[in-house]
Amino acid sequence: MIEVSHVSAGYDGQDVLKDLSFSLPQGENLAILGPNGCGKTTLLRVMAGLLPCRGDVRVDGRSIARMKPRELAAHIGLMSQNMQIPFDYTVEDVVRMGRYRMRRRGLFEAENREDGQAVRDALETVGLWELRNRTANTLSGGQQQRVFLARVFAQQPEIVMLDEPT
């Protein structure tokens, strides 16, 4: 469950979110719609722990402000609208990076069977397993977006948040 309680946040001293509260039970889906500049991305950044706020965001009863980044990554996977493919990495490497955000070891250190299977499953889910050895920055824009979606899936988070997913 996600609980957002009396959250206010913004940029340069100007609040975009003002005293926002809601809860989202486990297993439920939520779509946030609105015009440009209304706070959709700001809300997702706050919920992912990337933007400080006044108020509290809780996942399964625990405040995200008290979670370490790796712990937060195990709970929440965010696909941002502004993601860029790292230069000269393969599709598989980019997806693997999402998996290793939760680990203490580096990208190219030995992985266990679970890591490899999570990466494969994520790439198969988005239909890119066959392109896993291609340089990711040579793919079309839509394919690159699917790479980042697979990267979030490889984390196997409890909560997936998509910012401008279309």
Predicted segments, located by residue:
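The feature captures the beta-strand-to-loop junction immediately N-terminal to the Walker
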Residues: L33-P35
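Conserved ABC transporter NBD signature motif
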Residues: G55-S63, L72
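Conserved catalytic motifs of ABC-family nucleotide-binding domains
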Residues: Q156
